[in-house]
Regions:
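Bacterial N-terminal signal peptides that target proteins for export
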Residues: 1-9
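Bacterial N-terminal signal peptides
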Residues: 8-17
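Basic, amphipathic N-terminal segments that precede the first structured/catalytic domain
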Residues: 21-66, 105
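Surface cap/lid and interfacial helix-loop subdomains adjacent to catalytic sites
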Residues: 22-23, 156-171, 191-240
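Active-site catalytic motif of lipid deacylating hydrolases and related acyltransferases
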Residues: 28-41, 78-172
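Proline/glycine-enriched tight loop/beta-turn segments at coil->beta junctions
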Residues: 69-74
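Structural recognition of the beta-strand scaffold that forms the well-ordered cores
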Residues: 75-79, 126-129, 175-176, 205-208, ...
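Gly/Ala-rich beta-loop-alpha elbow adjacent to hydrolase catalytic centers
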Residues: 178, 182, 186
């Protein structure tokens, strides 16, 4: 599932140039006994953004801009990038706890505030907190531990998406958005839950940002070729 890790060599150099000096490493190989508790997505605390609560995704850059989430006809399922790194006792496991205040502050004050907000004029924003894999999962030589950590993270994404579909979607069209680690999970979510199913007809578009998408990764979902095309994906590098 996560063979795409091999594609990260160049972007890894970039990321390490930013975080390399301050990034802690997990203590030893992946240990199932240290995995944080599974999130309960019926609790709004386990959503970084949700239309039924006030959060950073509600912000607008100026008084003229409007948050249209209350009247929007579509939804946005947003998967934020890695914010689990740095030093401290809670940075020594392979997966972040969804109630880690330091990680959540990083997530909310950066990705949710400056990325998820661009969608609040078009749809209701749903951004689940998930037990994201540690940043080192993308650079370690311990590929087995990295894959296990990413699998834990992805299991949360699946659970959150399934809960969203069951209780909040109500047949509405939706956009899937991911950035970096979030894009890795979004790609697998689309391939396993959306393309080739009735849900595909509800997919407006997918934005898979900051991660390479191989031409043959999807069976049916194709790159968008026009502003009016639906059921397709857009992707680009977020660095030069």
């Amino acid at each position: 599932m996560y063979a795409a890790l091999r594609l990260l060599t160049i972007s890894g150099v970039f990321a390490l140039s930013i975080w390399g000096c301050s990034t802690a490493r997990p203590d030893g190989p992946f240990d199932p006994g240290t995995v944080p508790p599974t999130p309960d997505y019926s609790k709004l605390d386990n959503w970084a953004a949700h239309p039924d609560k006030a959060d950073a995704a509600d912000r607008t850059p100026c008084p003229e801009a409007v948050d249209w989430q209350k009247t929007a006809q579509a939804d946005v399922f947003f998967l934020y990038p890695t914010s689990y790194y740095g030093r401290g006792t809670r940075s020594k496991t392979w997966n972040a706890a969804v109630d880690d205040p330091k990680v959540n502050t990083r997530t909310d004050s950066a990705s949710i505030l400056y990325q998820a907000t661009i969608f609040n004029g078009a749809g209701r924003v749903f951004a689940p907190r998930y037990r994201q894999a540690h940043l080192q999962a993308f650079f370690t030589k311990d590929k087995e531990s990295a894959e296990k950590a990413l699998t834990v993270a992805y299991s949360d994404v699946l659970a959150a998406f399934d809960y969203y579909l069951k209780y909040w979607n109500n047949g509405r069209p939706f956009v899937v958005v991911g950035h970096s680690q979030g894009s890795v999970h979004a790609m697998n979510l689309i391939r396993e839950r959306i393309e080739g199913t009735p849900l595909h007809s509800k997919l407006i578009a997918a934005y898979l940002v900051g991660w390479p998408v191989k031409r043959d990764f999807f069976r049916v979902v194709k790159p968008c070729e026009s502003p009016t095309e639906t059921g397709c994906f857009c992707t680009w590098r977020t660095w030069e």
